[in-house]
């Protein structure tokens, strides 16, 4: 009997001792991040159900967006990140003054130039019709890997004319960099780095890149007044008999200043680009059609159009004024095509330009939350 009691007591001590030594799992509870929808902006946001916004995910995404080791390499001449081409001061576009890409025409680590110039990364959380000049990434794409910003990250890393990397190499590299595994654990509940979570983190950060505090925004909120020239330009912008910009770029009631749709806007008469909207839709009327980009911060971007043919906004306005090209595929909304353009006189062109410049948001262009971190996780 005494022996049995000793055995039971010993077994109890062993079991309770084991319980004390067993680590208690830390619950995975990332901090939800709710986008503060600006005045007058749409309430529908394009955020995938499998990638909810969190403070930790956005923080990690910001590091990854700017870290040149996203190339999967560590040699100084082989570093490339999202920010290499998407510069904050140029509304996350390359810009004509890019130090490494003369004229704003980017090329990848292989030296191969990108097929089209960069699009700005701005207010993309409201884009639900398709990403890229042709809209080849869209939510209901039958190809699951071609649907959203997350997929864009992967394609950018793999593209020969961009990072020219390998997803396995990239995720393995970040697994070895001090500080990153801990950030992945905080953001996604596991210190094991996966490329899928790299995609998710960067996409979360990109969805925070919201511009909503330009002079025009302040005017709409009743905080400032526009000059007479700017008001004249606004009237031109929003009227069919004026500059007729609003059909493609939105007018009153569309603070995004884009419809996110695709148009043949009369640039050419021959269409040989294998990456226009027709390549996606198969609709013959989409020959030579490309996304109407947002005009927010357009002043600091450029070059303009899908192929960067115009270096300045003045050139763009001149084109729409009297250089439109007739073709069988011209979009029906180009109502002034038979006149060769909208035929603006010099003062009207100046007024239109002055209005477009009111869409510049310097707060967005300098927001420290969007800027490169002072240091990366392994440098702290």
Q: How does the language model describe each region?
A:
Residues 15-18:
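C-terminal motif of bacterial Sec signal peptides marking the signal peptidase cleavage site
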Residues 171-182, 186, 190-212, 299, ...:
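C-terminal capping alpha-helices of c-type cytochrome domains
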Residues 23-146, 214-319, 324-331, 367-380:
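Short glycine/threonine-rich turn/loop motifs
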Residues 42-46, 154-155, 163-168, 186, ...:
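Flexible glycine/proline-enriched surface loops and loop-helix/loop-strand junctions
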Residues 2-9:
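Sec-dependent signal peptide recognition
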Residues 143-187:
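A short, charged helix-loop
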Residues 57, 81, 145, 149, ...:
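Stable alpha-helical elements in mature extracytoplasmic
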